[in-house]
Amino acid sequence: MEPLIELKDLEYAYPYASPALSNISLCIQRGEKIALVGSNGAGKSTLLLTLNGMIRPDKGTVTIYGKPVSYDRNSLRKIRQKIGFVFQDPDVQIIAPTVWQDVAFGPVNLDYSEEQVQQAVSNALHSVGLEGFEKRPPYHLSGGEKKRVAIAGILAMDPDVLILDEPTSMLDPAGSEDIMDLLDELNHQGKTIIISTHDVELAYPWADRIILMEKGRIIASGTPEEAFSDKELVRRARLKTPILLELSQELKSRGMKTPGTLPRTVLDIIRIIEHNHHGSIRLSDNGYGTIHVGDVDLISGSHIQAILARTSCDTIGVMGSRAKICARQWGLIPDISYAVIDKCILQAMNGRTSLILTTGGMVTRVFERVSMFNQTNNRSIPVRSLIGDEIPDDLSGI
C-alpha cells in the first residue's frame, strides 16, 4: 500500500542552531493513530511542521499522496487543505472575532460557495460538539473549547490527516480526556491522526504506533508495547515506562505469567491477574451485567429518562461529542466519559449494568470491542441496543 506521507533522509537546522532533524525517514499510512513521543527539544514539533510543508527540510524529500512536495504556493495550498495542523496554543490559530467566522476562514479562502461554507462550518462544529457556539467570541471560551474551535477550523476543510502539536497542553484532566475522545471519534470516521506529546501515559493506550524521538532523531518506531518495552531506548529519550507496562513487568518478575499482548488498559491487567488465578476470581455472584447502547440520534431524551426512571442502571457512559452534548441537554451526569467501553466491560464483569450513549459508527465499535473481548477471554458479556421508543422492563436483564 502506498504511504499517505513518506519522509526520506530529512535534515533540518534552524538558523544558528544545532540540527533539529537528522536522518529522518518515516512512512505514514492512511487511518493510523500515531504519537511522536519525546522530551522537550527532541524535534517532535519540527518534524510535524514538515508533514504539511510549513517547514522545508534542508535535505531529503517529503512525498505526499505519492508526489514529492514542490513547495510552490498552489501545491502548499492543496496540501494544507488535506493535511491540517492544530498548534499547541490555540490562541495562535484562532484569529476571528466569533467562532463561526474563525471556522469559516478556511472554506472562504478555498472559494467555497456561501452554501458550502455554511454546511462546512455546521458540520465541523457538530463534529467537535460546539453547536450553538457560533456567535461566541473566542476569548470567552475555556482552553478546551478553544482547542475544539481550532480543530473545527481544520475539519471545515475536510482534511484526510489531522496533525496536533501537544493536543492536551494547558488542559485539565477532564479537558484532556474530551480532546483524546474526540480524536478517537475522528479516527473512527476515517481521519489519520498524528500527535506529539511527552506524556507517555496519554500516548501508550491511545496510539496505534509510537515514534520515539531524541535529539532530532527517530530512535524507535513500532507498537506502543514494542516502543516502551525497550528500557534503554526509553531512558535515552528521557521518558519513563508507562505505569501499566511497568506494573506488568514487575508482576512478571515475581513469577506471574502475562498471556497474550502486554497490557495497555486496566482491563488487560485484570486479565493477567485472572489468568494467574486460573480463572478462580469471581467478580460477581450474579453473573455478568448487561451493556446497553443507545444512539442519541435515534432516541430521545425523554426516552432515556423514562428508561432510567423505570429500571436499574449502575453506570452511564458517553462516547463522542454529540453524545456529550445530548447528555447535558437531557440533564444526565455521566459516570464515564473516557475509555468508556473498557470501563463498562469491567462493570459488567462485576455484575453491574451500564448504559452507553453514543452515535453512528461508534455504536458498532462498542459491539465489536465487547465481542472481541468475549472471544479472547472466553466471556459472554451481553450487549443490547436500545431501539426506537422501546422501554425495557429491566435494564439489568439479558
From Swiss-Prot:
Primary residence: membrane
Record membrane topology: Peripheral membrane protein
Cellular location(s): Cell membrane
CDD domains recorded: ABC_cobalt_CbiO_domain1
Chain positions recorded as ATP binding sites: G38, S39, N40, G41, A42, G43, K44, S45
Known EC number: 7.-.-.-
GO molecular function, one term: ATPase-coupled transmembrane transporter activity
Protein name: Energy-coupling factor transporter ATP-binding protein EcfA2
Encoding gene, per UniProt annotation: ecfA2
